[in-house]
Amino acid sequence: MTITEIRNLLQGEVSSEQLEELRADERKGVQKLLISYEKRQAKRAQAVAQFQDRFSYEKKFWQKSQLVAGVDEVGRGPLAGPVVTAAVILPHNFDLIDVNDSKKLSPKKRKELFPKILAKAVSVSVGLANNDVIDRINIYEADRLAMAHAVQGLKVKPDALLVDAMNVPLNIPQVKLIHGDAKSNSIAAASIVAKVFRDNLMDAYGEVYPEYDFKHNAGYGTREHMEALKKYGPTPIHRRSFAPVSEYEK
């Protein structure tokens, strides 16, 4: 085979017999390709092992034939827009190994995984609390309320919840995990769903209020956002209970 043919071969599944033949090929170009291939395989094997480790909490419930939902939120810190939460129930055979804490993934990867999670999950639900609710009951309680709405919106009722660092105000057994989106695939999937949903929502608000650059800042207090607040005052989606916003109320 030519070097190009071997390069193409190593992009897919390779049998042990083929690998033995390539290892016996003394061409430097072939050996370089083999080294790169083996590094990729080792990296993938590590990713698969870590992915399986992130099912350790789920397996405790699966062993008892129980359904468990991962719950996470995004948007506690922004000055504008809602806090968005998601609840996700994953099947035992869930195999999207790239699913991880949404903060560790690029926007492109999150958007790529979003529809795949929706397609493979047993059930997915989104809950949100808008700025009026946040201003009325505070961000922490609004977050908990939105989480409850997300869980209640699931088409299948879970037997238990895995929650990222919060307690959901529902009478369902739950495990609170600090940095849960890095420890549980169910929470990680929920973090991706919530993040992409909120980003899409803030993109839409960016069309309505272009001066505030919501498409790029998602409601966070960037320099451009603060300059627009100073010049134009708050929009109907701003959180007036947040100090920087109230200072620019006209």
Swiss-Prot record:
| Keywords, in A-Z order | Cytoplasm, Endonuclease, Hydrolase, Manganese, Metal-binding, Nuclease
Q: Where is the RNase H type-2 domain?
A: 66-250
Detail the disulphide connectivity of this chain as listed in its UniProt entry. Answer: none
EC class of this enzyme? hydrolase
Spell out the subcellular localization from the entry. Answer: Cytoplasm
Q: What is its EC number?
A: 3.1.26.4
Manganese in keyword set:
yes
Instruction: Name the predominant localization.
Output: cytoplasm
Q: How is the cofactor bound?
A: Manganese or magnesium. Binds 1 divalent metal ion per monomer in the absence of substrate. May bind a second metal ion after substrate binding.
Q: What positions does the entry give for a divalent metal cation binding? A: D72, E73, D164
Name the catalysed reactions: Endonucleolytic cleavage to 5'-phosphomonoester
Biological process according to GO: DNA replication, removal of RNA primer; mismatch repair
Q: Which family does it belong to?
A: Belongs to the RNase HII family.
Q: Output this protein's name.
A: Ribonuclease HII
* Source species of the chain: Lactobacillus gasseri (strain ATCC 33323 / DSM 20243 / BCRC 14619 / CIP 102991 / JCM 1131 / KCTC 3163 / NCIMB 11718 / NCTC 13722 / AM63)
